[in-house]
Amino acid sequence: MKITVLVGGVGGARFLLGVQNLLGLGSFADGPSKHELTAVVNIGDDAWMHGVRICPDLDTCMYTLGGGIDPDRGWGHRNETWNAKEELAAYGVQPDWFGLGDRDLATHLVRSQMLRAGYPLSQVTEALCKRWQPGARLLPASDERSETHVVITDPTDGERRAIHFQEWWVRYRAKVPTHSFAYVGADQATAGPGVVEAIGDADIVLLAPSNPVVSIGPILQIPGIRGALRSTSAPVIGYSPIIAGKPLRGMADECLKVIGVESTSQAVGEFFGARAGTGLLDGWLVHEGDHAQIEGVKVKAVPLLMTDPEATAAMVRAGLDLAGVSL
């Protein structure tokens, strides 16, 4: 069984744990497995900060699957310290709203050194994963720059300007007047090595219940990926990130509002659309009690709370069942 999953950060990483639980991979393995898991990971959040390249979603997936994630925050290193952040603040270095943990900083330093030496992000990620042994192949959506920027009304002067997604998300917590998202560099990027093949060779492709606008959306903006999803012989099954009109974490509702999409399972399913038409989905899972009816898409209501890897594995199995795919 080959499963390919499109993911963002915290929620996507937890979803991957459920896939591993079902397949007996990674920390859930009790011997060799015939199954393969590939994650196509969002790079829209990536940015240069304090001279190092940060890749939040790649790192969150790597740390989570490798057992090094901070379990309370859901991101960053377990047992993190913040000495470097305190020293940077003492120097008055900007941006002061973005903190790099000491352990996390080591990852960014290694990545930045390799990037400056000419290695592409996909090879850098593969090298970093040798330490963490995530039990899955983590593929950046692209090796090229493709960043999510946000057009806001600047609260300091009332002028419109574009800022990096990290500033909108971390500094402003999405609480400034917001007008649109821009995927800078996406139109000039190409799908990362192995990405199109992972979609085409899969037995099933899953869209994790990550933020549809700033996690899954930036992946779909990269030329070649949407086409691969539409042409693959594998069924494409999506999971609603909205439960009872609200996202469980993050600010998906704020993002959806910006692009004029309601925070409902119905609306998000329609946002992705049916592959039978011009969209991507063959199946769409919504939380029990929620409802959706999308022409050309099989819809099923099941529990979608990722309370633990076992509960998440049940979600994954429900997706396989909806697609008629057997382990």
From Swiss-Prot:
Signal peptide: none annotated. Its cofactor is Mg(2+). Its EC number is 2.7.8.28. Keywords: Magnesium, Transferase. It catalyses: enolpyruvoyl-2-diphospho-5'-guanosine + 7,8-didemethyl-8-hydroxy-5-deazariboflavin = dehydro coenzyme F420-0 + GMP + H(+). GO terms for molecular function: LPPG:FO 2-phospho-L-lactate transferase activity; magnesium ion binding. Pathway: Cofactor biosynthesis; coenzyme F420 biosynthesis. It comes from the Bacteria. The keyword Magnesium applies. 7,8-didemethyl-8-hydroxy-5-deazariboflavin binds at D59. Catalyzes the transfer of the phosphoenolpyruvate moiety from enoylpyruvoyl-2-diphospho-5'-guanosine (EPPG) to 7,8-didemethyl-8-hydroxy-5-deazariboflavin (FO) with the formation of dehydro coenzyme F420-0 and GMP. Homodimer. NCBIfam families: F420_cofD. Belongs to the CofD family. PANTHER family: 2-PHOSPHO-L-LACTATE TRANSFERASE (PTHR43007:SF1). This is Phosphoenolpyruvate transferase. It comes from Mycolicibacterium smegmatis (strain ATCC 700084 / mc(2)155) (Mycobacterium smegmatis). The lineage of its organism: Bacteria, Bacillati, Actinomycetota, Actinomycetes, Mycobacteriales.
